[in-house]
């Protein structure tokens, strides 16, 4: 039986800051080239058409266009950017 009460308030009182991961642009939204679309750790979402992947797995738009979040098969997601047609 312990003779001291187990108190860990000074050792346990720390937490890491949030990394603000996740989608930064919505499906159907217009983006410019270089815009960050999705911040992530690993490839939770894969790069599709006109989307690049940074060194920290961040997905970004390579061209101006409309964002589309798509499914690749049953368990994989991808984000693409499609150019806006010039018919007006």
UniProtKB/Swiss-Prot annotation:
GO terms for biological process: translation. The keyword Ribonucleoprotein applies. Transmembrane segments: none annotated. Signal peptide: none annotated. Gene3D superfamilies: 2.40.50.100. Keywords: Ribonucleoprotein, Ribosomal protein. InterPro entries: Ribosomal_bL27 (IPR001684), Ribosomal_bL27_CS (IPR018261). GO terms for cellular component: cytosolic large ribosomal subunit. It comes from the Bacteria. One of its GO terms (molecular function) is structural constituent of ribosome. Residues 1-20 are annotated as: Disordered. Belongs to the bacterial ribosomal protein bL27 family. This is Large ribosomal subunit protein bL27. It comes from Geobacillus stearothermophilus (Bacillus stearothermophilus). The gene is rpmA.
């Amino acid at each position: 039986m312990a003779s001291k009460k187990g108190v860990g308030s000074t050792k346990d009182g720390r937490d890491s800051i949030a990394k603000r991961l996740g989608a930064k642009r919505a499906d159907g939204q217009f983006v410019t080239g270089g815009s960050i679309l999705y911040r992530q750790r690993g490839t939770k979402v894969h790069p599709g058409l006109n989307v690049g992947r940074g060194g920290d797995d961040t997905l970004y738009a390579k061209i101006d266009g409309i964002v589309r979040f798509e499914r690749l098969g049953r368990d994989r997601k991808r984000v693409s950017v499609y150019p806006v047609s010039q018919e007006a």
